[in-house]
């Protein structure tokens, strides 16, 4: 996937970049794998904002993705590589020999016509999914499960990858994209390869309107609000925040304040903390 640059014909286009979508092979998704996706706009069932800066954006349909990769021993062939508006990675449509169709995350170098398979007997090949115990040390993986059978939860964004570092009893050591080294049950599955569309992080939005197309609403600084709206608000002109450390809108310390729960149950699985 390449990056497309534009001539500065307008201020919005001056620094804007987009994907060239060279890897995409079709613009029509598989209808049987679509589901309706209603707008939440960051509200809960009471209509109260629980996530700020969300709302608007283009209408989308959800693509049902196979994160579990539990169709063991049945080979499938890549039919298309498609764009998914709900995630940064591209997706691949797999046609299995028994007639079933499924979407999977498209790893880097996966092409139309290639064969993929799941299960303990699958080869160590791009796009295949195996239990971690069957994956050799040093292999690059993505879409890693945290509990066997639950489906992949880690390393699913565009361009991300993890590496199998070693095996200790019923656990496997995995180094994640953040640098964190973590123990994962060896029965958990992972897919071989790096997630595709690795150029995604280089895209420049270019203008505010394009963020709105993506469903992102503006972020307003607390210092320009009123005291009733934010701890940093109020004062005459450009005033300091008046606190010994920056605060969130709800009065909690922020910017460097550790928010991870102390003595969290999963702490025992973290061998080395992520890089700062």
Curated annotation (Swiss-Prot):
Q: Where is this region: Disordered?
A: 1-20, 219-276
Q: What is the lineage of its organism?
A: Bacteria, Bacillati, Bacillota, Bacilli, Bacillales
Q: Which GO terms describe its molecular function?
A: RNA binding; rRNA binding; structural constituent of ribosome; transferase activity
Quaternary structure (record): Part of the 50S ribosomal subunit. Forms a bridge to the 30S subunit in the 70S ribosome.
- Name under which the protein is recorded: Large ribosomal subunit protein uL2
Q: Which organism is it from?
A: Bacillus cereus (strain ATCC 14579 / DSM 31 / CCUG 7414 / JCM 2152 / NBRC 15305 / NCIMB 9373 / NCTC 2599 / NRRL B-3711)
Superkingdom per UniProt: Bacteria
**GO CC annotations, alphabetized:** large ribosomal subunit
Q: Which InterPro entries match?
A: NA-bd_OB-fold (IPR012340), Rib_uL2_dom2 (IPR014722), Ribosomal_uL2 (IPR002171), Ribosomal_uL2_bac/org-type (IPR005880), Ribosomal_uL2_C (IPR022669), Ribosomal_uL2_CS (IPR022671), Ribosomal_uL2_dom3 (IPR014726), Ribosomal_uL2_RNA-bd_dom (IPR022666)
Annotated Gene3D superfamilies? 2.30.30.30, Nucleic acid-binding proteins, Ribosomal protein L2, domain 3
Q: Where is the sequence biased in composition, kind Polar residues?
A: 7-20
Record's keyword annotation contains Ribosomal protein: yes
**What family does the Swiss-Prot or TrEMBL record give for this protein?**
Belongs to the universal ribosomal protein uL2 family.
Q: Name one GO biological process term.
A: cytoplasmic translation
- Keywords of the record: Ribonucleoprotein, Ribosomal protein, RNA-binding, rRNA-binding
Ribosomal protein: is it a keyword of this entry? yes
**Which is a Pfam family this sequence falls into?**
Ribosomal_L2_C
């Amino acid at each position: 996937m390449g990056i497309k640059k534009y001539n500065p014909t307008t201020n919005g286009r001056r620094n804007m970049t987009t994907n060239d979508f060279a890897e995409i092979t079709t613009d029509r998704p598989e209808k049987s794998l679509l589901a309706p996706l209603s707008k939440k706009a960051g509200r809960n069932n009471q209509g109260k904002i629980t996530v700020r800066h969300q709302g608007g954006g283009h209408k989308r349909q959800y693509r049902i993705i196979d994160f579990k990769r539990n169709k063991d021993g049945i080979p499938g062939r890549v039919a298309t590589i498609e764009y998914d508006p709900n995630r940064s990675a591209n997706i691949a449509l797999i046609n299995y020999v028994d007639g079933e169709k499924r979407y999977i995350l498209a790893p880097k170098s996966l092409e139309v016509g290639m064969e993929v398979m799941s299960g303990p007997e699958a080869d160590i090949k791009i796009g295949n999914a195996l239990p971690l115990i069957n994956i050799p040390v040093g292999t690059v993986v993505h879409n890693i499960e945290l509990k066997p059978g639950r489906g992949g939860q880690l390393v699913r964004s565009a361009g991300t990858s993890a590496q199998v570092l070693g095996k200790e009893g019923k656990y496997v050591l995995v180094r994640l994209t953040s640098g964190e080294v973590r123990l994962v049950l060896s029965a958990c599955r992972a897919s071989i390869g790096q997630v595709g569309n690795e150029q995604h992080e280089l895209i420049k939005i270019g203008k505010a309107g394009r963020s709105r197309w993506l469903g992102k609403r503006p972020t307003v600084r607390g210092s320009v609000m009123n005291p009733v709206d934010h701890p940093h608000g109020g004062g005459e002109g450009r005033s300091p925040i008046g606190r010994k450390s920056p605060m969130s809108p709800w009065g909690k310390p922020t910017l460097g304040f550790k928010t991870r729960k102390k003595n969290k149950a999963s702490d025992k699985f973290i061998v080395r903390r992520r890089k700062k």
